[in-house]
């Protein structure tokens, strides 16, 4: 049975039921708009520090949108954005950004997740207008005009294979083994973010470009600019720079798969010869808050409750860990999302050698206390 791990949130259920689901007011200092092609933008002035700005492209797509032949290519595509675009061939973009004092990794970066990909130009010194124009042009090219030249793809294979080699330590390998237990028989269980060695060595070029053309469309993207800028001027620049990106003839639907319920607890023992410690991970699956309730006062109240739960449990487990007879080395508790279709409360216990049963029991006693007596 898919358990509803209500926790302290149940204490607030009566209030939630009678509250009007009023939308939270937007920050009046944030200018929000949408171009005809579907691209959304957010702009806010912030002059601390002066003459600095942040530029982001958020894309509502990640590894979960890959097909089997595209495993790892959402992340691979992120790398290709730094290897040649329409207006910045080869390494021109990186070279230019470094020429104005930006550093790769610190000011220039990107991140690929299971359900989203973000490109960031952070803390950029905007000492002249042309720098703003070029940063927006870089996001424009990431959005729809990455070159993905065969020779650049082949050159990047080795880079990502080395990243994979260093990333896949014992914890990562056990995480990959755990995916089917988290996500059941859904496509989510097959996605590893970085892909297999064989896949990275041998995928055909079109697999990467097919993913890019299908998913990197303006209706799936947002541009964010925050910094010491004139908001109206930035809005005009965004409209001028991004309006040439074509809207898809048929918008691509982002399919989301429900995580199957289970009648009995799912138990797995996962090992790795290079593991340096032992721990117990526990998940309680929950239905997510309905999308229409996001950005409402109810959602905000629940987020505060979750934060307080996690804070209280963190302090409680810290106190227990500090005791000399504690069966575990550390423990944690959190409430978040497993994917867009499933939220989860999660616990993690690192236990002393030979004390798995005692550590699990001590952890669950605290969970039951939390549920039954509301932290008193």
Segments predicted by a language model, with ranges:
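Active-site-adjacent, His/Asp/Glu-enriched structural segments that form or flank metal-binding
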Residues: 51, 59-173, 192, 202, ...
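Mature N-terminal segment immediately following signal peptide/propeptide cleavage
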Residues: 23-57
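His/Glu-based metal-binding/catalytic segments typifying zinc-dependent metallopeptidases
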Residues: 251-317, 348
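Histidine-acidic residue clusters that define the catalytic metal-binding segment
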Residues: 22-31, 119-123, 129, 137, ...
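An aromatic/glycine/proline-enriched structural segment found at the starts
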Residues: 222-278, 374
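A structural supersecondary motif
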Residues: 103-107, 283, 310-350
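Bacterial Sec-dependent N-terminal signal peptides
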Residues: 1-22
């Amino acid at each position: 049975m898919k358990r509803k791990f209500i926790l302290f949130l149940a204490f607030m259920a009566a209030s939630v039921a009678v509250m009007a689901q009023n939308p939270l007011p937007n920050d009046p200092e944030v200018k929000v708009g949408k171009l005809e092609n579907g691209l959304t933008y957010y702009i806010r002035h912030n002059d601390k520090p002066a003459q600095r700005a942040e530029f982001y492209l958020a894309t509502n797509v990640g590894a979960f949108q890959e097909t089997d032949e595209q495993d790892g290519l959402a992340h691979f595509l992120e790398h290709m954005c730094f290897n040649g675009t329409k207006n910045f061939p080869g390494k021109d973009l990186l070279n230019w950004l470094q020429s104005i004092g930006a550093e790769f990794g610190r000011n220039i970066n990107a991140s690929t997740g299971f359900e989203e990909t973000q490109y960031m130009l952070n803390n950029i010194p905007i000492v002249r207008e042309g720098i703003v124009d070029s940063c927006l042009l870089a996001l424009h090219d990431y959005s729809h005009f990455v070159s993905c030249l065969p020779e650049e793809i082949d050159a990047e294979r080795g880079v990502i294979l080395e990243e994979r080699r260093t990333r896949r330590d014992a914890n990562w390998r056990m995480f990959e083994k755990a995916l089917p237990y988290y996500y059941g028989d859904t496509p989510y269980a097959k996605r590893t973010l970085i892909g297999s060695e064989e896949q990275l060595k041998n995928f055909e070029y079109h697999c990467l470009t097919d993913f890019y053309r299908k998913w990197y469309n303006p209706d799936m993207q947002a541009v964010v600019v925050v910094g010491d800028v004139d908001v109206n001027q930035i809005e005009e620049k965004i409209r001028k720079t991004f309006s040439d990106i074509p809207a898809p003839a048929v918008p691509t639907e982002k399919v989301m798969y429900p995580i199957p319920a289970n009648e009995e607890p799912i138990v797995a023992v996962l090992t790795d010869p290079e593991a340096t410690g032992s721990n117990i991970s526990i998940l309680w699956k929950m239905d997510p808050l309905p999308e229409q309730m996001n950005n409402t006062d109810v959602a905000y109240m629940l987020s505060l409750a979750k934060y307080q739960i996690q804070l209280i449990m963190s302090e409680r487990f810290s106190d227990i860990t500090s005791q000399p007879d504690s069966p575990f080395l550390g423990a944690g508790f959190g409430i978040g999302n497993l994917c867009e279709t499933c939220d989860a409360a999660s616990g993690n216990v690192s236990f002393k050698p030979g004390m798995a049963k005692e550590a699990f029991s001590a952890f669950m006693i605290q969970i039951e206390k939390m549920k039954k007596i509301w932290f008193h």
